[in-house]
Amino acid sequence: YITDNTEALEYRLKMIREAKEEVIVSTFDFNADTGGKDVMSALIEAAHRNVHVRLIVDGISGFLDMLGDPYFQALASTENIEVKVYNPVNLLKPWTMQARLHDKYVITDSSMYLLGGRNTTNLFLGVYGKHQNIDKEIFIYAKEGESASLKQLKAYFERVWELSDSKEYRCKKKTDRVQNSLKELEERYPKLEALYPDILKTWDWEARTVETAKVTLLSNPIEAKNKEPHMWYSVNQLLQTGKNAVICTPYI
């Protein structure tokens, strides 16, 4: 488990740095604060290496944080980066606002993913500011080929990505503010290497994990509408099959 916020940021930076083909990021909240810019900078650096980057963000953050923001516009304007917003806020349809994307994970290539409760903001990544949230993430590494849960997560992402509820976020005009923001994010990456020198080292991913027999991911329906409680049913079924259960949740 990743329990430390600085370690959580370093894992993201290292995973993105080592990506050769693809980076997938899903998050509920993404801010253009210090931690958010760190991740943006890493994504842009990866895109410049011809890594295909896809980012999906919930519509509330899309409305409050991304709308017209020059840093997100810079990110979306970068070649090899695609950005979508799940269920964008529509003030004419307030009844749709309860359908939110709370998924928070990072996938790189076909070898690893990080999944948990951390948003992409100062509250969850690094030690920026006076307040930090306490959260946990699980890191999964597939030693040889794709693991079953990695395939499951990638398939889940593709379904969410292709939903009609997931709308493309585009840079409509590359203004001076956008170009200056892009330059700032590009120049930020060498500073990250100095701030977090561990990402320059070789990581033994296998040594950082514990072998498991199986990892299974559960989810509710993904459409932006009222949903059947599939998760509740699945958890109840699992609780009936074992002698011991451990549940870790930030919400109760």
Put a short name on every predicted segment.
Residues 88:
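Short loop/turn segments at beta-alpha junctions that line or gate ligand-sensing/allosteric surfaces
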Residues 1-82, 91-103, 108-252:
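Charged, low-complexity intrinsically disordered terminal segments
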